[in-house]
Swiss-Prot record:
The gene is rpsM. Located at the top of the head of the 30S subunit, it contacts several helices of the 16S rRNA. In the 70S ribosome it contacts the 23S rRNA (bridge B1a) and protein L5 of the 50S subunit (bridge B1b), connecting the 2 subunits; these bridges are implicated in subunit movement. Contacts the tRNAs in the A and P-sites. NCBIfam families: uS13_bact (TIGR03631). Residues 94-124 are annotated as: Disordered. This is Small ribosomal subunit protein uS13. The keyword Ribonucleoprotein applies. HAMAP family: Ribosomal_uS13 (MF_01315). Keywords: Ribonucleoprotein, Ribosomal protein, RNA-binding, rRNA-binding, tRNA-binding. One of its GO terms (cellular component) is cytosol. It comes from the Bacteria. Residues 100-124 have a biased composition (Basic residues). GO terms for molecular function: rRNA binding; structural constituent of ribosome; tRNA binding. GO terms for biological process: translation.
Amino acid sequence: MARIAGVDIPKQKRGVIALTYIFGIGRSRAQEILAQAKVDESKKVSDWDDDEIGKIREAVGQFTIEGELRTEVQISIKRLMDIGCYRGIRHRAGLPLRGQRTKNNSRTRKGRRKTVANKKKATK
């Protein structure tokens, strides 16, 4: 297994797909990196030689990825919460941020359902 940016890249996959295992690198950025390193996109990781891996490491090093990117995202979310804007309030409350309805859905953000017991009706 090739190790790039602290991530084990699977050997049996094509280069474009394998690079997406790194947090912060999607398909288009992976294609861009391989073009910059002059490595064939359809070539499997197991067929890469040390020279190609070195070029890919250099190209990947130019981007903000993995832990650095995660930290950046966390800091920007914390900033939104600190300034008290709408998005920050929604983050704090654990609700969807982008205008989705919350009456029926949004279970991913809210978490599991919390059952609420029925009130007993008052007798006359």
